[in-house]
């Protein structure tokens, strides 16, 4: 059960999103789990402005999981060039081929099955589950930690087990279970555009 402060937070965030959030990115509103996954992997350790360019290149060349899975390693690594952290690219290919071989190129629609895929952690699994399948899993990244810590006055270190539990519990309480995709995108955008790190 949400407290009145928690209810107010969720309501105001969704209100801000509806009236003022004009942040545009090519993957916003997309329901294709492949494209959501691709965007999330590209954005790990990469700024959004740079990531957009790579996302467009990848989605134009490899339109679905099977086309990526069938590509030659050398070709994919060449396209990835400049993004660094090549382990991300290696995991991308491994997972694409696993899904091609074991699931006819389809993403699982279950959060826990998504989480089992190589290179996919809790954050990316929640993003895919909520954006593609509208499942009620809160995304929790640096933006979300910062917003919740500031608004709710949480001082528990986020890199501690206690902190992770506290923030995860709160994030899932705040999540609008009827509109998880809308809520998750809203809180990420609010953290990126309004509640910035050095304010």
Model regions and ranges:
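Catalytic cores of DNA base-excision repair glycosylases
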Residues: 2-7, 12-199
């Amino acid at each position: 059960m949400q407290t009145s402060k928690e209810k107010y937070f969720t309501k105001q965030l969704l209100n801000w999103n509806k009236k003022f959030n004009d942040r545009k990115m090519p993957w916003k509103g997309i329901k294709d789990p492949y494209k959501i996954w691709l965007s999330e992997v590209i954005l790990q350790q990469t700024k959004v402005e740079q990531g957009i360019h790579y996302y467009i290149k990848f989605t134009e060349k490899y339109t679905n999981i099977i086309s990526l899975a069938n590509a030659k390693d050398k070709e994919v690594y060449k396209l990835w060039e400049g993004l660094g952290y090549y382990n991300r690219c290696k995991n991308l290919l491994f997972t694409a081929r696993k899904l091609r071989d074991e699931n006819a190129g389809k993403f699982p629609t279950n959060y826990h099955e998504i989480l089992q895929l190589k290179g996919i952690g809790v954050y990316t699994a929640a993003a895919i589950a909520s954006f593609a399948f509208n499942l009620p899993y809160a995304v929790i990244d640096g933006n979300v930690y910062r917003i919740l810590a500031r608004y709710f006055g949480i001082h528990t270190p986020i890199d501690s087990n206690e902190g992770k539990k506290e923030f995860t519990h709160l994030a899932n309480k705040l999540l609008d279970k009827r509109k998880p995709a809308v809520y998750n995108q809203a809180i990420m955008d609010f953290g990126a555009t309004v509640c910035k790190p050095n304010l």
